[in-house]
Amino acid sequence: MSINIEQAIIHEISQDSQGQLRCRLRPQPLLNGQAVEMMLEELHQTYTSKSGKGFGYFGIHGDDGEANPAFANALKEYRAGDLGFVEFTGQASKLLQEELAKYDFSQGGFLLMSCYTSMASDYLFVALLSAKSSMTVLDDMELSQNNHLDLNNIQLAARIDLTELQADKDSRKYISFIRGRAGRKVADFFLDFMGCVEGVNTKAQNKTLMNAVEDFVASSDLTKEERQQCRNKVFEYCSERFDEGADIEIKDLADELADQGMESFYDFARGGSYELDEEFPADKSTLRQLKKFSGTGGGVTISFDGGHLGQRVIYDPISDTILIKGVPANLKDQLDRRLKGE
């Protein structure tokens, strides 16, 4: 296993016959058996691999809008040993119930909370899971419908880096959370119940890094091939950091580039007007533009590796055209068939 589970528990928030939300609290933690280990391992992998996560911190009531300090205070008591895990998670469930009650769309769900260790960091994982209906075949070959937790489609989840929280009280990124689809913050209520305030604009930082890299290679004496190697190296480094759940460190990245013969990136990035933080989380979807060009519009979708620009792919901005040399075999086959049919 890539994680070491300390404790885990599930509480249920559901609607009663009058449509009121109620908490059904589990009286003891889940036993750390195979089922729990497999579930949390899967959730850990799924959550870690999700790109586009947001990052924040516990807001201070009054200074950061209407941030609710109740969750942070309960967590502090739990970490200090003044509150048991069951009591802490029970309080959290009731806080979530109160927040959900403000919205008409909520149906509740199963609140999973778990403390575990991964890569020498302690985490508190918080997720509101939903049940999904499925069919199974019984021993007598009859079909039966049952419900199971939908672990592959988690949309309401957050993870608190307890190690970073303890080491750096001024950090603004020790809480990560899943953003809503298409950039919509559909999970605002989930962050509100924890009193989480967004602290780092991850996409903006990654976009700025990408711009700094492009400006760096443009101002250098590198050949075209060396420039693409630089972009590829940046993407490779950032991808590794993303997969490890670690931050991009500008100094560390500059050292990686220096090892490849590309000196002075750190001074270039810090000396300009880029306003890059020394450390920030990686966003693969943004940085992928270092390796690929892609775009969609008017019923046309184009995607190709950056190294092909100027060789197999010729762009003429004056005529607003793209020429592709060596059409992919499967596309060529489709086009030839269509021409013959016409």
Curated annotation (Swiss-Prot):
One of its GO terms (molecular function) is double-stranded DNA binding. It is found in: Cytoplasm, Nucleoid. InterPro entries: Nucleoid_associated_NdpA. GO terms for cellular component: bacterial nucleoid; cytoplasm. Keywords: Cytoplasm. HAMAP family: NdpA. Belongs to the YejK family. This is Nucleoid-associated protein SO_2177. It comes from Shewanella oneidensis (strain ATCC 700550 / JCM 31522 / CIP 106686 / LMG 19005 / NCIMB 14063 / MR-1). The lineage of its organism: Bacteria, Pseudomonadati, Pseudomonadota, Gammaproteobacteria, Alteromonadales.
